[in-house]
Amino acid sequence: MTDILDIHTHKQEIDSQGKSIINYPLLTDSPLYMPLAKNAEVAVSRGLLLEEYLGFLNEGEGLVDALSNNVFSARKGYYYSAGIHPWELAERNADQQLAFLQKQLKHKQFVAVGEAGLDKLAAAPMELQLTMFKKQVQLSEKHGLPLIIHCVRATDELLAVKKEFRPQQAWVWHGFRGKPEQAMQLLKKGFYLSFGEYYPDETMQTVPDERLFLETDNSSLDIEDILCQAARVRGVEVA
């Protein structure tokens, strides 16, 4: 089967098969002390993150050094992204996360900034989210790296930031599940769209090949499964 890039995954290195951009956790706060989640989806994801965190500690390898000591511990042959997720953002940890992020982006194995973005269901105030998101836009531009975006109910605010900065680097909306009309709006604004396991078929069908990415994110599926699913929806064959 054709090799396909998994542009955004939370899988461990051993499960990513060496063809993924692994989201590198900036756990400057223990998951036990992260801001309270406002909805069920966030709460479930937070629980899974805590489970992964404890699993890393028990295994004593992989990302454990980074999680325990905030030092870079990547494996040769793998590539990463790092960003300040709005779910994990709070006044008490914002500066620490930013400093840690700036340090990680100096390593060549980091090939993207993110996931970063805006989320009106997150506990962090929107003003703080905007401040930290803009700082990550600046880091994306400084390092010449694409920005992987998390956006929930904040499209207008996101577009306003894009208009303000006029970024030269690619902005990739990850886990896109919107309607075709929203997809067309974002495509006209220069966005790339990344699709995971769930999305409206008609939306996937509207995105041109050159603006389309695929991802596993938190899915149990492999990227090959995501590719085959997308191929069926788009009516093409996988070589």
Language-model regions, residue ranges each:
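Mid-domain alpha/beta scaffold segments of enzyme catalytic cores
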Residues: M1-A239
